[in-house]
């Protein structure tokens, strides 16, 4: 941050010297009083809520949306926040303040016949959960939302309009927030957004109007206010700011960036996350000294409409959000508010008419000049506001207002077409019992039956006149839980223990098995699924996304066929179908235990990370845990029905080291497990962290290799694995790549030819559970396409390539699946990939492991070299370590190069020596895999060289452990 500040300061000085002077002559930063404030520690009871009870309540509330199956969705959610913020600065301010807040959001959405999306929302905010409305009240509100959104769906679309309007308290609150509140934010008045800067002391609103921002208000009009705080994010005490008094502009919202005439902060410097504070709104309150009844304001509107020759005026009842441009950076000084419910109020007294598709637009001064009157009762709009300093909680409070002239535009037309099929109803029972008698539990059954029944309906009925029907469908769903823990120097940085969630993917193909609509392999549509929603929720999720996927694939199929008609494939490629047919299969694998003890993992991470306190040269040190358990389900239209549980838990250790030459090096290692139960003890993990730290620190004063070296090099441990995995386990190598063109770079072209040293065999084990006492994470019994693979798949024999691995997607060099489709480990991207299970590099004609170094030295002597080199990498390490070995004495010492280049595949055709010892490694990247490989190999004619390292200036302030 100091370096960044210096850079910005230099840029500011240059800007002052090279650009026209700014009209505002105020300083860049203002003084502020020293504050001392300490909120009492948060009682433990606030950190825990009865999740089961709240889930029951939310289910009861959201069930009200089931009254109308055609709604796209209906949700009730609770966000509960407990935070404790610490603010200190060099001036002596020390502020500690708490925020405990609960917010329930109700949301539903319909789609009109023309594709227009029609969302409707309602929220409740309270600083005490017991103060939230009763469930009965929220159910009533949800039912009312259903009626309103259905009415909105059938409402006519409004055309662009100018004329009089009324804005409800909620709508006018958002209106004032967007067009006025943002233009009161002081930092915007420095340059660009200066709409009201020179209007201080002038009438900007009717003289009856008062506008102020007051972050000290916790309640207003019987409602808790979201913009409440005691101190802002610069440690300045919050205070009320009277922006408009009797219609006259008096003041702006100030952070510690001053303006001419406003030299100090008034407690509105706000931010979120790691962004710099700027002046932001808090609780914006609009009041009037001369309130009118709604009937009086309606009469005003009708009279004004007649005066302007308009048939009607508008009443804006609810809005969802808005945005504004304040003129900064050359932007247009304008605003756009997005109403949800808008009514025409007819001048002749006819009943109001609901319309949709209205956007309220304009420029602030013009709009303000037409504000005429305000009502009696205030409404509260709760929200969060996004700007350059992040998202901050805000509130806008206003009565209904009457405006003599507004402007609207017609909302941009959506390309979305309503679903072809009607939504599946609620409360139906599965139409089949195919999963009875399997290992499926009740949760499995609700998911699988939901997927299967909706797929049958879609396959039977999904069609658009004149377009091809789907010939193939595949649904993926994963039910998962995750854990993420990080600790630094013995302190917990974060712990995210996320409960069960769900996500899916939908594939709907048109065309045929010979030529389908995929433009790329795995053309799925990510599918949001309500966690815990059961059979009905599963069906509705796949109904929505099947329709989207079908329409997308109709377009991609037309695009693909047009391209192929214009550019016919070569005969050898044309005969290859896009897909392989699958035989029906049902395999439901039982779930297994994955017990997350977040406290235990947090304690373990803290203990292990504390080890770094003994290594003052290492910075940015951390120990973290990352894991997920997933039950992944797949159902296809070929009657492939699968459930596969899979999981991982990864320990990551990382650190930075500033080397003697000024360059900064990052390093780390990881350990991979299937479940938390396999994690080693604190003592073992601490020992591994210490070993890593000692090896890393030893690099600090190691010089860079000055001369280019070309000769024999021994690759040891993981460094002996990388030449094989990096050269072979990628698409177009041992993994077949789908491409609708001749593929000259495909490794498959070399089937039957030499690619490795004749002493090397490579076998892919699929179901092998362990090897010489080590558990293999790569073991699997059936692949993600439902194919049972061979237990051993020979890939290379005596250096000759025998075959490559593939899924159910024929390619030029792999026409059939080898059972190598795997579900990926990322629960946020449910997909399939091609992968090995256990990759075994076997060798004959090996050398005893303890003689490998002698072989290396012998080769060096033969070449009359003074030194030879060894590259090693401990299990899971991120970087490689280089050792220089004296040919005469055998002495080893650390060396360093700036770029480590692994051997190419062609260099592996002749390996000088291969260790008889084998190492076993478990890896967890896209999928869980295992590797069995010789512990070392020696290759000749390897080139090692270095570039000049990039030196970085040391921090101006020493790392705390180095002081």
Segments (PLM) and residue ranges:
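Short linear motifs in exposed loops
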Residues: 98, 253, 354-356, 645, ...
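Glycine-rich phosphate/pyrophosphate-binding beta-alpha loops
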Residues: 182-186, 255-270, 340, 358-364, ...
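C-terminal, non-catalytic macromolecule-binding modules
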Residues: 248-303, 800-857
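Short aromatic-centered micro-motifs
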Residues: 243, 344-345, 508, 795, ...
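Short, small/polar residue-rich loop motifs at catalytic or cofactor-binding pockets
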Residues: 235-238, 337-340, 787-790, 877-879
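Hydrophobic alpha-helical bundle architecture
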Residues: 287-366, 383-386, 842-905
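Active-site bordering "gate/hinge" segments
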Residues: 1-231, 236, 240, 245-248, ...
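Long hydrophobic segments that form regular secondary structure
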Residues: 236, 307, 787-788, 798, ...
